Amino acid sequence: MKPSEISLVSYARGPGLGPCLRTGATAARAFAYSHDIPLIGVNHCVAHLEIGLLEGATDPVLLYLSGANTQVIAYASEKYRVFGETIDIGIGNGLDKFAREAGMGFPGGPKIEKLAKGPELLDLPYSVKGMDMAFSGLMTAAKSKLDSGHSIETVTYSLQENAFAMSCEVAERALAHTGKTELVLGGGVACNERLREMATIMTEERGVKCFIPSKDLCVDNGVMIGWLGHQMVNGEYKITEEDNKVHQKYRTDMVEVTWR
């Protein structure tokens, strides 16, 4: 592809780690300005939601589970509203932290998934309040169970079941609260087959539809960033100078959704 064939450069301006965001923004600006191409910075979390809509959903609740972010989101009053979220650590970071302390290495999520065979379900903290969740106590308790002599298979199974049950519970509460009839999964943790199974069971029992993107679209990817930029510039979103500055704490509900 030639630069002359590119009509827009889109990059993630936040949320995220400052050095990573600035590196991406610098590269995007340099390329866009040198070839006189329009530039837009987009919200990483909203990009996960928008790419999920390509599965066929029209007005869903998004269960967004990644390393740093754990949120249940839905569109209301011209913004994607956060109806519930983690109040301590993201589910993915929690799983990675447990795996690291258990000597399993990084990334922890896929390794936990392979080991989580059960069959015994240990008593671990289940922390849900309304549509908010907390995972740090769960991870600490799981490590204590491992240190006390329980097998890694039993501990990872119990840890995974608890974490995903909490996530599916808040998703179901959001469906009930909003009256929406579609659920979309997003984020790297949504690659987990057990989570996909639990979300599918929950939505079937509730009588709503479940849309799960392919795994290469659940993890962070350039397609979702480009697609959201395309949606925004074709949906009467007015690009300002502020839109091209990185924002480490760029929350989902800070974005004006003009393209719906």
Summary of predicted features, one role per range:
Residues 213-257:
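Glycine-rich phosphate-binding/hydrolytic loop that grips phosphoryl groups
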Residues 11-14, 31, 66, 183-192:
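Glycine-rich beta-strand-to-loop/alpha-helix junction loops that act as flexible
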Residues 8-10, 20, 60-64, 184:
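Short glycine-aspartate micro-motif
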Residues 58, 63-66, 71-150, 200-201, ...:
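A short helix-loop
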Residues 41-42, 183, 200-225:
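Conserved phosphate-binding/catalytic loops in two-lobed NTP-binding clefts
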Residues 114-183, 189-206, 230-236, 251-260:
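A contiguous, well-structured pocket-lining segment that forms one wall/lid of small-molecule binding clefts
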Residues 37-61, 228:
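Conserved phosphate-binding catalytic cores of ATP/NTP-utilizing and phosphoryl-transfer enzymes
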Residues 1-29, 33:
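Short beta-strand-loop/turn "lid" adjacent to the catalytic site in phosphate-handling enzymes
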